[in-house]
Amino acid sequence: MLGLDTPHDHHGGARRGRNTVRQFTFGALRVVHMGDIGCVPDETTLAALRGCDALLIPVGGYYTVGAEEALAIAESIAPRCIVPMHYRGEGFGFDVLGTVGEFTALFDAASVHTLGGDTFTLTADAPRGVIVPRLLHFV
């Protein structure tokens, strides 16, 4: 596992502290979890993550990057699949967060794969694009 230190905000971490981006390697598969990233990372960080198989990235904004910045990060890293996280949905999430639809609307509809369940298996032949699992939430 690789951990990369990044600021959590646009002020070098002065407002929200630091964030750790984690890269996990499972055989030939690389999975990147962006944590609570709140700004576009520097080029050195982006280069270390480039070409990963799966990118888990917040898209809801306010506490983290929003849809547009998440897209910019994803385009720079160029993962095989993107899994959005930290957003508001029907019946869950903070009112200040954007929805997953605000992020997926930035992509061609054919590249957005909405799942019927909350899990999927990442394989070498998994579909490219945005993977949106059905989220479980508790009231």
Residue ranges of predicted features:
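Core dinuclear metal-dependent hydrolase active-site scaffold
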Residues: M1-R50, A54, Y62-E68, L115-V139
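Proline-aspartate-enriched helix->loop->beta-strand connector
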Residues: D53-I57, G61, A67-R88
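Charged helix-capping and loop-helix junction motifs
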Residues: R16-G17, R50, G66-A78, V96-V100
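Short histidine/acidic/glycine/proline-rich micro-motifs that form metal-
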Residues: H8, G61-Y62, R88-G93
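Binuclear metal-ion centers of metallo-dependent hydrolases, dominated by the metallo-beta-lactamase
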Residues: C81-V139
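Glycine-rich loops and low-complexity Gly/Arg-rich segments
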Residues: F24-G27, A48-L49, I57-V59, R80-V83, ...
